[in-house]
Amino acid sequence: MPASGHDAITIRPSTLYFGTPVALVTTLDERGAANITPMSSVWALDDRLVLGLSGQGQGCANLLRGGEAVVNLPDPPLHAAIERIARTTGRAPVPDYKQALGYRHEADKFALGGFTRTASHAVAPPRIAECPLQLETRLLHARRSTPGDDDDAHDPGFIVIELAVVHVHAHPAIVLDGTQHVDTARWSPLLYVFRHYFGTGERRGRNFRAET
């Protein structure tokens, strides 16, 4: 029988990053040093964010201890700066599973990535000035994931984290004049699609609840 054009095959991809925004999560360690965690497992519901972070990452440890973070949302031109810090960790010594992936310790990811730190209004961790959207947040809940049957025994697992957004900062260039709305014609988030970086294309339509 000829293919209909909508037939599907069963595959087992190594990752399910089908297309989510990249975020740079800034936190403070116990000495007050700032860390940047690049990640892409984040989604929003009203004024809440839900994140998935590695259970052995420095950023996760900082957030669980300090209860505060800034979720900075970059645009596509920042992808090269993000990749400069991608294979680094604030943890020392470097966890075994990250050593196996070629990670190295980096105490100052701001300098390595060429990022500018700027003070937050309501939380201690700094914002990243280059990111067009910067969300100050406080921790509400955290839950460790349940291992699956196929999970590697050496995999550190991940933590599901719920955050409350307490302040939103935006570059004026992406805000509609005289409003509180982000101009979707000017704002293009950096997307992570099966470990590749993309921006958004032209608008295809609008949801019935859109206010602009």
Q: What is the predicted role of each segment?
A:
Residues 1-212:
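Basic, polyanion-binding surface patches
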